[in-house]
């Protein structure tokens, strides 16, 4: 006889304990022929409304992560290319500077300032500080903010000036963590193409989900902390052959309150409803369609949509929330008689006219 899936009811918060208790009891009694796999459906959700980590990179930076992928703390996520001398010459100046990047509120434009440490940085300037046009950035007021926005990056760097034989000057800004004082010295001659600084590597400071944004003047990597959330609190899905022995076996497990039943009889879960549960648990494969770079949002709250890819493929639901920036929709789908919110990319749904 083929096993079917049933829903075991428990108190919310005791799902893992019930799963553990059933597995231990199956192992101890050896009735694997009656009780099989056990699944607690979970989804990964963002744990915060703002990025846990934000990295601003040059357009030439090489990315080692993709949009929507999960990373662990310490993973290599990006690297800036090495810095090479554009022309031959002599290093005539090496100074400490502070790099300050100001971004407009709409995130469309940025302005970068390199302020000599000798000029003094205005007190109170830090990442996240809102600034207005005309605000002094240095104590000597030689460096003035030219746009309204907020500071998104502050970093100590070295300004290296190389004077060419014809009297012109090439300026390089080298981050302190790749600055080599043996390589960069005042009075040292450098050849065209000579490496002034090695590639700068960036490692994830936190674990989470990656969002990559590609602007014309820069690249950004944002890492959002994530957490796992029970999709159906109080439900544990058990694959079993339903007979008196199996019923009493599961029913006697601590914290089990019963089965989802009709007329006093446990009701097996329909294959169509079980399919997304198995996909989320990694027990059934499905084709994950690639998301386009940009999709025009043609949806509004209240629209009825059909899910066309992912674990909930072929289910229909109603749009409850729209996130235009991430091109994501929160859709309520009805499964097992419950309305369950799922977050989907706009490319994973189509509107039902």
UniProtKB/Swiss-Prot annotation:
Keyword list, A-Z: Transcription, Transcription antitermination, Transcription regulation, Transcription termination
Regulation of this protein's activity per its record: Regulated by autoinhibition via interaction of the N-terminal and the C-terminal domains. Autoinhibition may prevent NusG from interacting prematurely with other components of the transcription complex or non-specific interactions with other cellular components.
Any single GO BP term: regulation of DNA-templated transcription elongation
Domain KOW, chain residue ranges per copy: 301-335
PROSITE patterns in the record: NUSG
Keyword ATP-binding: no
CDD domains: KOW_NusG
GO CC aspect terms: cytosol
Main function: Participates in transcription elongation, termination and antitermination.
Domain remark from Swiss-Prot or TrEMBL: The N-terminal domain interacts with RNAP and the C-terminal domain binds either to Rho or to RpsJ (NusE). Contains an additional, species-specific domain inserted into the N-terminal domain. The N-terminal and C-terminal domains can interact and form a closed conformation.
Recorded family membership: Belongs to the NusG family.
HAMAP family: NusG
PANTHER family recorded: RHO-INTERACTING TRANSCRIPTION TERMINATION FACTOR NUSG (PTHR30265), TRANSCRIPTION TERMINATION_ANTITERMINATION PROTEIN NUSG (PTHR30265:SF2)
Name by which UniProt lists this protein: Transcription termination/antitermination protein NusG
Native source species: Thermotoga maritima (strain ATCC 43589 / DSM 3109 / JCM 10099 / NBRC 100826 / MSB8)
Gene: nusG
């Amino acid at each position: 006889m083929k096993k079917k899936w049933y829903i075991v009811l428990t108190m919310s918060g005791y799902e893992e304990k019930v799963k553990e208790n059933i597995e231990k009891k199956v192992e101890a009694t050896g009735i694997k022929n009656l009780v099989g796999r056990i699944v607690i459906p979970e989804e990964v959700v963002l744990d915060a409304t703002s990025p846990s980590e934000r990295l601003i990179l040059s357009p030439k930076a090489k990315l080692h992560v993709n949009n929507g992928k999960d990373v662990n703390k310490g993973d290599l996520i990006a690297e800036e290319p090495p810095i090479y001398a554009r022309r031959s010459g002599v290093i005539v100046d090496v100074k400490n500077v502070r790099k300050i990047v100001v971004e407009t509120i709409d995130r469309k434009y940025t302005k970068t300032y390199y302020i000599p440490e000798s000029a003094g940085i205005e007190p109170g300037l830090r990442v996240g500080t809102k600034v207005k046009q005309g605000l002094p950035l240095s104590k000597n007021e030689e460096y003035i903010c030219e746009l309204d926005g907020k500071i998104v990056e502050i970093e100590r760097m070295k300004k290296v000036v190389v004077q060419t034989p014809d009297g012109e000057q090439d300026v390089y800004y080298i981050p302190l963590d790749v600055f080599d004082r043996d390589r960069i010295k005042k009075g040292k001659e450098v050849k065209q193409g000579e490496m002034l600084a090695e590639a700068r590597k960036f490692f994830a400071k936190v674990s989470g989900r990656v969002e990559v944004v590609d602007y014309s003047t820069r690249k950004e990597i944002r890492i959002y902390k994530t957490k796992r959330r029970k999709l159906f609190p109080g439900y544990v899905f058990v694959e079993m052959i339903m007979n008196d022995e199996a019923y009493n076996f599961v029913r006697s497990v601590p914290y089990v309150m019963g089965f989802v039943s009709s007329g006093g009889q446990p009701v097996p879960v329909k294959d169509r409803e079980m399919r997304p549960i198995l996909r989320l648990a990694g027990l059934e494969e499905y084709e994950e369609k690639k998301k386009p770079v940009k999709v025009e949002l043609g949806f509004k709250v209240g629209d009825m949509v059909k899910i066309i890819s992912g674990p909930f493929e072929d289910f229909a639901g109603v749009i409850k929330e729209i996130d235009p920036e991430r091109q994501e929709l929160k859709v309520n789908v009805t499964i097992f008689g419950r309305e369950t919110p799922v977050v989907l990319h706009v490319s994973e749904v189509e509107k039902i006219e």
